[in-house]
Amino acid sequence: MSLIEDCLRSYRFIAIDTEFPSTLRETTQHATDEERYMDMSFSVDRAKLIQLGLTLFDINGRIGGTWEINFSDFGVDDARNEKSIEFLRRNGLDLRKIREEGIRIEGFFSEMFWMLKKTRRNITWVTFHGSYDIAYLLKGFTGEALPVTSERFSKAVARVLGSVYDLKVMAGRCEGLSSRLGLETLAHEFGLNRVGTAHHAGSNNELTAMVFAKVLSPFPLFLRFGSLELRTIESEAIV
């Protein structure tokens, strides 16, 4: 944690990615945004975070450090989507090892919260298709269930986290790009390659940081208008 604290003094952007047991309630294709939010909060409130990736970087894309934090809270009897758990296993996540060697969610977020408060920096959070990422982050920092409506959720995010940018939303607003592009495809548009393994939080968020800086370079006005709204909550989480 001391290394993260040192980086916070020089880097105010944090790209995040999470790995979790996926959605616990299916959302219909034509559900309203509020219904999608209710399904997301149902899953996030009942499931436990497995892994969190953090990449601290600056506006020019210089990376201060990348961390992949494994949490020990997720156990064999906890709520899960079995297909998603098998997917994570196939992509190299050793859930037993994470359970044995990981750290507690509450302890990490408590320390991280006070670290951010101590540095007094205006942190900008960056995600890719990140409604669930932000929901788990908010839950971790507050230690509470998610707000009962999407409007209250957005207000809580603004109050607790401040500026949040979703790279997928940004891509949809940039000429020549599209919100339909996945992270890997978007990275290739800028000649960037992934470091590490896909579907691991650390690798995902480091790639998000690199692409964000590339997108921001020709479109610096994005930062003048404050944080973008979170992407409309999808019916199915991408883990």
UniProtKB/Swiss-Prot annotation:
UniProt GO cellular component terms: CCR4-NOT complex; cytoplasm; nucleus
Gene3D superfamilies: Ribonuclease H-like superfamily/Ribonuclease H (3.30.420.10)
Main location: nucleus
Superkingdom of source: Eukaryota
Reactions this protein catalyses: Exonucleolytic cleavage of poly(A) to 5'-AMP
Cell location: Nucleus; Cytoplasm
Species per Swiss-Prot/TrEMBL record: Arabidopsis thaliana
InterPro entries named in the record: CNOT7/CNOT8/Pop2, RNase_CAF1, RNaseH-like_sf, RNaseH_sf
Transcription regulation listed as a keyword: yes
Record flagged with keyword Endoplasmic reticulum: no
Gene Ontology MF, one: RNA binding
Binding-site list for a divalent metal cation: 17, 19, 133, 204
Cofactor(s) required, per the database record: a divalent metal cation
Subunit structure, as described in the record: Component of the CCR4-NOT complex, at least composed of CRR4 and CAF1 proteins.
Function description: Ubiquitous transcription factor required for a diverse set of processes. It is a component of the CCR4 complex involved in the control of gene expression.
Alphabetic keyword roster: Cytoplasm, Exonuclease, Hydrolase, Metal-binding, Nuclease, Nucleus, RNA-binding, Transcription, Transcription regulation
Family label: Belongs to the CAF1 family.
EC number: 3.1.13.4
The protein, known as: Putative CCR4-associated factor 1 homolog 8
